[in-house]
Amino acid sequence: MRPSTGRNDPCPCGSGKKFKHCHGNAAAPPSVGGAQATPLLIQAQRLLVQGNYGQAATILHRVVELDASNVDARHFLGMATAFGGKIGDGIERIRASLHAQPNNPLFRFNLAFWLGKTGSVGAAIRELMQAVAIKPDYHEARYQLVKLAMERHMHALAKLHIDVLLAVEPENPELHYRLATALLRLKEHTAMEREFRTLIARAPDNVELHMKLGEGLRGTGRDDEARAEYDTVLAIEPGNPDALYELAFLEERRHRVEESERLAKQGLALQPNHGFLHLALARVRRRQGRMEEALEMLRQIETANVGDACRVSALYEMGAILDKLKRYDEAFAAFDHANITDRKQFLDLETGTFYSKDANKAWFETLKDFYTRDRLAALQSYLPPPTSGPQPLFIVGFPRSGTTLTEQMLSAHPRIHGGDELPGLGLIEQHAAAQTIQNLEPYPACLAAVPQNGKQDALFKLRDFYLHIAAESRAVDPEKLHFTDKMPLNENHMGLMRLLFPASPIIHIVRHPLDIVLSCYTNQLYHGNACALSLDTLAFHMVETWRLVDHYIAEMDLRYARVRYEDLLNDPEGEMRRLLEFIGEPWDPRCLDFHKSVRVARTASYAQVAQPLYRSSQERWRHYHKHLEPVIPALTPLIEKLGYSVS
């Protein structure tokens, strides 16, 4: 079956414009899109636009036979072949034309389109990035790049190109919506809120805008304001099931289980097949201890006609309940099914993988090569330590290692404010460093240009950028000396921490690696380029992360303390006293009453940290030993190095 030309697809004429902006518009003039304008090519192009792909291909074959050097004809033949249904053959022909003209941005744009159609989104993004590098004003390519980047959760990349497009079209509402969504995913909360409120002012009855703003407010712990947005949705659309689900989730997170149940039932009475409302009710049943009822609800979701997002959430929930019931083999089967399903959204069909070991290994090596003792000393000579205002207290560690518990305990101290997971260091890596230094090299190489290009003030700007993001995220209390940043895998940024905040404490939480691997695999986590969606990639990423940490410790004079999660559970007062002494703060017994805090954790650990300390999470991996056996050999050296055992 041949694909039809959608209004947002590239025009078959090869102009590089969307169909709706070219021959999809009745007023659009004929164009050869840069081709050698022979009569046969013009005729073939008209046939392409009309959807007569077979006839167009026949003519283009003839042109190529007459002149094999006609690269445009070879390219359009690839387009005709792909539009005619033979996408693989079409891609190969387009690649061949690109090989002949590697700096042709149109050819790269069209190749990216078909790669995206076949699911090779990563390759498509790379082609589009090259297209706009060759032709910076190629806005159609940049639009497509933004779209694909957001589909792949590459929101920093998307934001970078949205900013370029907004400089050309500052009033484009679609771009502002995409910007707001990217800011939401990047946790740039103040800018996100500003964008959504501006959009809502123009379209006050747009339900999707209120839902997204509610999500953003919920993500900052502003539950009452989030609730107001969902209530607005219900005023616009009474009984809106998505709003009722979000309200039910808010109530469950606040441990108001009866109200959560009422809202879920209200929604199901109106839409009995809404998968997420069944999920909300199943969570309530789990909280109430009615496990078999919850499992039955979740099994119905698993087999119902719902999207993958709902099915995956239900499978994780099912696994959690089966784990509580000590039905470990069934639990692992549910978690395994969830991860296998969830991988599909990240799968690059060209490589057949969702996570590239080679690319991630190369990134770790890049950081090691850059952050050396000599280079850090040279860069720090341009940046005196900060002297005023609240400063970051970095809590680093792999996801599910105990960073949330540590932060909750420390933030109960009257001089420490809980900042949660802050995106600032990641944003510096992804785009802010290169933009601030105005260097074409990506991070960290762009930092090397600071002394050469007279950009010494750029380091001050990067530090201010981080503090600005922290303030926008409401992580900073001016009355307190410290604010925490517990973004998972921030240990990758220890070199950047040492450069920008040399006096800031770094608290590294470690836990038995097998417990971390199991806990990551049994929760829906996308940190570390979605490494947690497979046991093999999880183990690989953990080992490589520790190699990077060892490099940082060897190359830098860090203000660094390591805490074992198990020690924190077994001797909380002793470990907290040691940590506070390391930070330079006096002991305060409120650190042991963290579970009484009104502050809500916004991570997968939100239920656990609302309780006093419990030790059931220690050595949980033993229940799943046979399922973890494939990764034990890779992890054994790290396990032993950290003082743990597999015996």
Residue ranges and their predicted role:
Residues 350-356, 591-595, 642-647:
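Short, flexible loop/turn segments with low-complexity composition
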